[in-house]
Amino acid sequence: MQSLEILAIVALVVAAILAIVVWTIVGIEIRKTLRQKKIDRLIDRIRERAEDSGNESDGDEEELSALVEMGHHAPWDVDDL
């Protein structure tokens, strides 16, 4: 094989690896965004129900706490120290 062919094959392999890494990062960020939207919807629903009456949001609070306990940190829990 000529050196140009070897270089082309190496470039294709590197491009494929970079594409896999980039799309993996994109997928992770999309999942984070979707989970955060779900948490935001639950918080809004809890707020609306808390305004209407006092005790109807218990199920939503349990679902929210389950989401937060799954390893997703709520935006108000910042530990940047």
From Swiss-Prot:
One GO BP: receptor catabolic process
In terms of InterPro entries, this protein maps to: Vpu, Vpu_cyt_dom_sf
PTM comment: Phosphorylated by host CK2. This phosphorylation is necessary for interaction with human BTRC and degradation of CD4.
Bias class Acidic residues marks the residues at 53-64
Name the chain's protein. Protein Vpu
Functional note: Enhances virion budding by targeting host CD4 and Tetherin/BST2 to proteasome degradation. Degradation of CD4 prevents any unwanted premature interactions between viral Env and its host receptor CD4 in the endoplasmic reticulum. Degradation of antiretroviral protein Tetherin/BST2 is important for virion budding, as BST2 tethers new viral particles to the host cell membrane. Mechanistically, Vpu bridges either CD4 or BST2 to BTRC, a substrate recognition subunit of the Skp1/Cullin/F-box protein E3 ubiquitin ligase, induces their ubiquitination and subsequent proteasomal degradation.
> Keywords, A to Z?
AIDS, Apoptosis, Host membrane, Host-virus interaction, Inhibition of host innate immune response by virus, Inhibition of host tetherin by virus, Ion channel, Ion transport, Membrane, Phosphoprotein, Transmembrane, Transmembrane helix, Transport, Viral immunoevasion
The organism named in the record is Human immunodeficiency virus type 1 group M subtype B (isolate RF/HAT3) (HIV-1)
Entry GO CC: host cell membrane; membrane
Record note on quaternary structure: Homopentamer. Interacts with host CD4 and BRTC; these interactions induce proteasomal degradation of CD4. Interacts with host BST2; this interaction leads to the degradation of host BST2. Interacts with host FBXW11. Interacts with host AP1M1; this interaction plays a role in the mistrafficking and subsequent degradation of host BST2. Interacts with host RANBP2; this interaction allows Vpu to down-regulate host BLM sumoylation.
